[in-house]
Structures are given as structure tokens and as C-alpha cells.
A protein has these predicted regions:
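N-terminal intrinsically disordered/low-complexity leader segments
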Residues: 1-35
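HTH-adjacent hinge/linker in prokaryotic transcriptional regulators
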Residues: 23-24, 36-40, 46, 50-57, ...
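Key DNA-contact positions within bacterial/archaeal DNA-binding proteins
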Residues: 72
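Glycine-rich phosphate/diphosphate-binding loops that line cofactor/substrate pockets in enzymes
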Residues: 136-149
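Glycine-rich phosphate-binding loops that contact phosphosugars or nucleotide phosphates
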Residues: 146-269
Length: 269
């Protein structure tokens, strides 16, 4: 049983807050995945995730400055989720990152793609199947991600929801994944050192927002598209063949996400 001391020298059992920390991480990503509402909670969640790997070295005043909020606002945010002492919160946060990293390793060791490959070979054309299982694409995509500061997701809420586990996994591996708005009033322009993943599928998101492609490319970030069409000639395209049942489309999307996550963990950690 792992314990730490409170300021009054009483002992506090860290393991009791494991479930609470899971809920806390879910809340942080919920706030940054709702880019239409950039309120106090959004600023705290984003600032905390941007600086989470440095928490051991930050005082609460320094963290508040980086979140662009007051110390009292930050303390109030922590108390809502049951954390009354910043030192205890920091210990739990760091411990949670280590636990999630071990979980990634366990999932990698237990994963067997043989059955999934059989399903893909039965529903896809031979050229689509060979392209899907060819590992060259995942190497190039992971290299693009590795050489970027952040991953920016642009797409519908429905498609972006598939990336929820990847978002947490990559955060544990030191890479922040942020969902951008698809509306001009709240869209933030990706920076040159970002890697943008455009979830285009049938392309309606592009057809309905004629300004989107130009704004995405404005600072010349690295770009990856996932969907039926490659809207950007200078982007790396991961194709999901047309004419498939929605279940199979989702299976291929999830396959892309898993391969990217596990190869990145194996290659760069």
C-alpha cells in the first residue's frame, strides 16, 4: 500500500484515489474536446495537460500562471474533484501516468491481429487489404507525429470520439492531442510544429466549411487525412475504402488508431 504524508505528518493512502484520478483525466479531456466552450475550465484543463509532465517541479502558483488563472480558481477546480492538497494531487497525477504507461505495454503484449486480418481480407479488395496491413504507412505517420509538438484533431465529434483512448495514451507518452473546432469563430490555426489529423470520411466537413483547408494549411503543419478521399495532395492519406458497412469502416479506423499508438510506443519510448 503506497502512502504519502500530509503536512500534519498524518499518512494518506494514495491508492484510494485511483478511480478518482481516472474520472479527473476524463474530465480534462472532456473540457479540451469541447473547443466551442473555452471557459475557465477549458483554460485550466488545457494548461494542466500542457504542463502535467512537469508538475513535480511546479508550485501551485507557477501552475496557475501557466493556466492563466488565479491560484484560488485552480484550488477550487481541484476541490471539485476531491483534491484538497496540491502535493497529494501531484503525487497521484504522476502515479497515474506511470500506471497508464504499464497498461499500454500490457495491451501491446496481449494484442493479436490475426483474426482481424482475416476479417479485412474477406471484405476488402486485395489492393486495399495489402495497403492496410503494409507497415510502411504506420512508420511514416509515427515519424510525423514524433517530429511534432502536438496532434490536432479536426473532424466531427462522432469520429473524434474514436480517438479518446489514443488521446490518453499519447498524453502518457508525452504528446498532447487536442481537438480543434470546425467552426470559424472558434477555430484555432495549427502551428508549424503541429501534426494535424483531418477526419474527413465522406468529405462533408470540407464541403460545408470552404475556409477550413486554407486555415489548416496556413502555417504549413504536418498533415494526415483519414477517410474516403484525399483532400490534400501534400498530406499523408490513410484511406478507408468506400462502400463498406459502417461497422467495417469503424473497424478500419480503430485499426489505424491502434497501429499508430502501439508502433509509436514501441519505437519512440
Amino acid at each position: 500500500m503506497k502512502k504519502t504524508k500530509n503536512k500534519d505528518n498524518s499518512w494518506y493512502d494514495i491508492s484510494k484515489r485511483g478511480d478518482t484520478m481516472n474520472c479527473f483525466f476524463n474530465a480534462l479531456f472532456m473540457f479540451i474536446n469541447n473547443p466551442e466552450v473555452r471557459d475557465l475550465n477549458y483554460r485550466i484543463a488545457l494548461g494542466l495537460l500542457e504542463n502535467g509532465h512537469e508538475l513535480d517541479y511546479l508550485t501551485i502558483n507557477e501552475l496557475a500562471e501557466r493556466c492563466f488563472v488565479s491560484t484560488s480558481s485552480l484550488n477550487r477546480f481541484f476541490r471539485i474533484y476531491g483534491y484538497k492538497k496540491y502535493m497529494i494531487f501531484k503525487a497521484l497525477f504522476s502515479s497515474h501516468l506511470r500506471i497508464r504507461y504499464v497498461q499500454i505495454q500490457n495491451r501491446m503484449n496481449d494484442k493479436d491481429y490475426e483474426m482481424l486480418h482475416k476479417v479485412f481480407s474477406s471484405i476488402l479488395k486485395s489492393e486495399d487489404y495489402e495497403r492496410l496491413i503494409d507497415m510502411s504507412w504506420v512508420k511514416e505517420v509515427c515519424e510525423m507525429i514524433h517530429n511534432s509538438k502536438r496532434i490536432i484533431l479536426i473532424g466531427s465529434d462522432e469520429m473524434a470520439s474514436f480517438f479518446s483512448r489514443m488521446q490518453t495514451d499519447f498524453y502518457v507518452m508525452g504528446k498532447l492531442v487536442i481537438k480543434d473546432s470546425i467552426y470559424k469563430t472558434n477555430f484555432f490555426t495549427p502551428e508549424k510544429d503541429d501534426c494535424v489529423i483531418l477526419l474527413s470520411m465522406e468529405g462533408r466537413i470540407v464541403d460545408l466549411n470552404s475556409w477550413l483547408l486554407d486555415k489548416m494549411k496556413e502555417n504549413n503543419p504536418k498533415m494526415i487525412t483519414i477517410g474516403h478521399y484525399d483532400y490534400l495532395q501534400d498530406a499523408y492519406g490513410l484511406t478507408i475504402p468506400q462502400g463498406l458497412d459502417e461497422v467495417f469502416e469503424n473497424m478500419i479506423l480503430d485499426y489505424y488508431i491502434q497501429k499508430i499508438t502501439y508502433y509509436y510506443a514501441e519505437k519512440y519510448l
